[in-house]
Structures are given as structure tokens and as C-alpha cells.
Amino acid sequence: MSNSIVHDVTLQVELTNGNDGRGNKWFSSAKIRKSMESLLFGHSRTPWDFPTRVVVTRILGPGQRLWDSSSILRGNWKEIEDALVCLGWWHDDGPKWIEKTEGEQDASQRDNGPAVRVQVYRTES
């Protein structure tokens, strides 16, 4: 599999881990997605016409601790991803366009955090 980076951006959005729970109310996540879409409005683009792999890096802010690795993508990343789909990054968030999403953390840039870095790679089998 060949991977070449096609987009690399740091968004001034705090990645949450979802420890506060979501319950079974869909409108809560819809509200978060709309809020993220408004925050990220300047990042609109034309969708990629090829499959991608996404690396999401949580950039820690001052005083924040590293999470368990399984917590990185379980919080508000889904709403951020949905907002980016609405802003034209992908046609949709299905496996045809996003084959894989990986989560990482970076404690070396605390002056820039909290933030989330999104790296999009073109994937070809």
C-alpha cells in the first residue's frame, strides 16, 4: 500500500475523550457536529476522489495529561469528522473514502494546544 500525504492541518479545537457520556440522545452529537462545522467553516474544500487514511493527533495543552490510547478517537472526533464531511473534505465518512483512522497524542507542543492535527494520506492498494 502506498501512502502520500495530501493534507496536513492543525485545527484549534480540543479533542475530548467522551468520559462524560452521551446517553442515547442523537441530537447531542448533532449539536456538537453543527458547532464544530461553524468553528471549522474556513476549512471548506472539494472532496478527494480517492480513498484516504487519516491520522488524528491530539495536541495537549498546558496541564493536560496523556490518555489511554483507546480514548483518543472515542470522544468528539466523530463529530469533527462529520463536520469536515459537511465542509467537503470527503464525499462521506464511509470506508470507500476513509479506509482507516489512527489516533495519536503529542505532548511536545503544549504552547499550541489544546488542538487537533489532522493528516490525510492518499491510499492505494
Language-model segments: residues:
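Catalytic phosphate/metal-binding cores of nucleic-acid and nucleotide-processing enzymes, i.e., regions
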Residues: M1-S125
